[in-house]
């Protein structure tokens, strides 16, 4: 099986001229922001779509991510009720969450290569339809076996909502927009997980657990219609890196020549393959034509090669760190979700089933703060740093703000352990959960955008690995958390987690210090991208 280096696919190695007065490049409006990637001359290029069309696609995929997680977590606070009504143990009932999380992660390894090969639109339509049917099946289930099978079936479809949604952001938005858009997407995933228990707790308390799934089916059905009418195909065959052209300054063997804090001004060549205006040589697709689910298979691609391609990419340091960071950011929220009812329902708190879900309000506030840091702030910070660097964007500038959510989460994990074991006021527990929830959006968004910046040609495959690993970790924690806390107590268990979290998150320091050199070496020397053509 032939392998290529990243540099053969993207000579920029992630470093691009983001601000320039060079008239041979396409810019944002009349300003000096260089569009990366450069749009092609084809009017059907997703980068050329109108704002409303891009935002309609973006809203549709964000809703799918949110509603899939809402449907998957809506029964979280009713495991005790389900165990009593369907004659199973609470541990078995918790499989309605843990098994679904695992299947969603593993489904990435099927959905992503399928979408690259057959197109993202047919995959999203099929995946949302499976999720929708699974919710109806679950709501009508007469016994636990049927309910679990339906949840797993729907979870398989819902797995497409994570890595593929992030890949679509890469398809339709430019580099200077990615941070904010990725943060909105991540917060859609996180808020779905928080809204499920929050809404489901009260709904199930008064209407029964079946209505939790009926609600999910109704919302997913509406979302399926939105995807059909407003999410056309975003897959597009473009030059490996048309914004860089053949400029030797961006492919220098010495990264210090182009990445210094005051590097020389870079001028991209005038031989850019893109033109500033759409070409009449390409027929423009009508709206009705865009509704066609089928756009053909990827020219020259091998499906089995696409299935295998993501695995070696985990060796790239940025990809490995992003998978680790997302998993660690998710870990404390998984633990709290698994333990919240056992903490808040017994004395001294005496919360009802419905009221337990209120802890997710604190989580949503924390996730909102994390999204602000990981979206708006990193875009503004990256822009500021690029302008100070003579217009040159360096992906590692995003990682400096990674430190802020890391500190907040570290403190939140410690506070939660002490607050529960010492039976502090419930408001302290809520505050701690809000703090540790900051990382679920802040840390995840920053690292996923960093991966897209570094490995643009294989971003979808990298995101596939990141999301798959993250969900496997979540599955393991779902089973391990209760015995872990029982054996060690809350202070020691969450103290251990905070130590693991802080120690492994510190691995961002080598990327901050030597990231450009690491990228240059690995992209030019490591041939890890399998590239077999049929």
Description of each model-found segment:
Residues 1-68, 72, 90, 210-211, ...:
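Intracellular terminal tails of multi-pass secondary transporters
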Residues 53-90, 106, 111, 161, ...:
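Extracytoplasmic
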Residues 54-72, 152, 315-333, 434-435:
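Pair of pore-lining "gating" transmembrane helices in MFS-fold secondary transporters
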Residues 69, 98-101, 105, 112, ...:
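C-terminal transmembrane bundle
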Residues 71, 86-87, 110, 118-119, ...:
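Helix-breaking motifs and short loop linkers at transmembrane-helix boundaries and internal kinks
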Residues 143-151, 163, 212-213, 322, ...:
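Short hydrophobic/alpha-helical segments at membrane-entry points of transmembrane helices
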Residues 151-189:
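Cytoplasmic helix-loop-helix junction between adjacent transmembrane helices
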Residues 177-205, 211-223, 227, 363-371, ...:
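Glycine-rich segments within core transmembrane alpha-helices of 12-TM secondary carriers
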């Amino acid at each position: 099986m032939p392998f290529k280096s990243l540099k053969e696919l993207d000579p920029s190695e992630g470093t691009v001229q983001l601000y320039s007065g060079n008239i041979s490049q396409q810019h944002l409006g009349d300003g000096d922001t260089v569009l990366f990637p450069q749009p092609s001359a084809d009017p059907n290029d997703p980068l050329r779509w109108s704002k409303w069309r891009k935002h309609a696609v973006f809203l549709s995929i964000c809703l799918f991510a949110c509603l899939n997680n809402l449907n998957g977590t809506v029964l979280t606070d009713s495991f005790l009720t389900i165990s009593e009504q369907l004659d199973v143990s609470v541990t078995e009932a918790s499989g309605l969450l843990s098994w679904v999380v695992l299947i969603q992660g593993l489904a990435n390894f099927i959905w992503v290569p399928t979408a690259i090969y057959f197109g993202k639109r047919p995959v999203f339509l099929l995946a949302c339809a499976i999720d929708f049917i699974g919710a109806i099946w679950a709501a009508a289930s007469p016994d636990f076996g049927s309910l679990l099978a339906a949840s797993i079936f729907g979870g398989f479809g819902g797995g497409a909502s994570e890595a593929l949604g992030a890949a679509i952001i890469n398809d339709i938005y430019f580099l200077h927009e990615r941070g904010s858009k990725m943060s909105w997407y991540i917060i859609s995933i996180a808020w779905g997980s928080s809204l499920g228990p929050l809404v489901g707790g009260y709904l199930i308390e008064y209407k029964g657990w079946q209505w939790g799934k009926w609600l999910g089916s109704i919302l997913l059905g509406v979302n399926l219609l939105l995807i059909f009418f407003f999410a056309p195909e975003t897959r597009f065959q473009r030059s490996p890196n048309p914004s860089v052209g053949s400029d030797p300054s961006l492919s220098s063997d010495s990264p210090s020549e182009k990445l210094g804090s005051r590097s020389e001004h870079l001028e991209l060549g005038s031989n850019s393959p893109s033109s500033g205006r759409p070409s009449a040589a390409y027929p423009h697709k009508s709206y009705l034509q865009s509704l066609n689910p089928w756009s053909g298979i990827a020219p020259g691609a091998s499906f089995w090669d696409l299935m295998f391609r993501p695995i070696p990419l985990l060796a790239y340091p940025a990809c490995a760190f992003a998978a680790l960071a997302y998993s660690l950011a998710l870990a404390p929220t998984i633990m709290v979700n698994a333990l919240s009812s056992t903490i808040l329902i017994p004395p001294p708190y005496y919360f009802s089933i419905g009221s337990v879900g209120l802890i997710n309000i604190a989580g949503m506030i924390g996730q909102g703060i994390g999204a602000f840091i990981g979206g708006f702030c990193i875009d503004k910070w990256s822009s500021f740093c690029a302008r100070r660097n003579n217009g040159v964007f360096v992906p590692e500038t995003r990682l400096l703000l990674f430190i802020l959510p890391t500190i907040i989460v570290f403190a939140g994990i410690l506070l939660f352990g002490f607050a529960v074991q010492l039976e502090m006021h419930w408001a302290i527990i809520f505050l701690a959960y809000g703090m540790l929830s900051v990382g679920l959006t802040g840390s995840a968004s920053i690292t996923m955008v960093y991966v897209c910046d570094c490995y643009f040609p294989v971003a979808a495959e990298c995101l596939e690995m990141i999301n798959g690993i993250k969900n496997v970790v979540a599955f393991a924690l779902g089973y391990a958390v209760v015995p872990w806390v029982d054996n060690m107590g809350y202070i020691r268990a969450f103290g251990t987690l905070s130590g693991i979290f802080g120690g492994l998150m510190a691995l961002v320091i080598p990327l901050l210090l030597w990231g450009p050199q690491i990228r240059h070496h690995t992209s030019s020397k490591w041939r890890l991208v399998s590239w077999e053509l049929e």
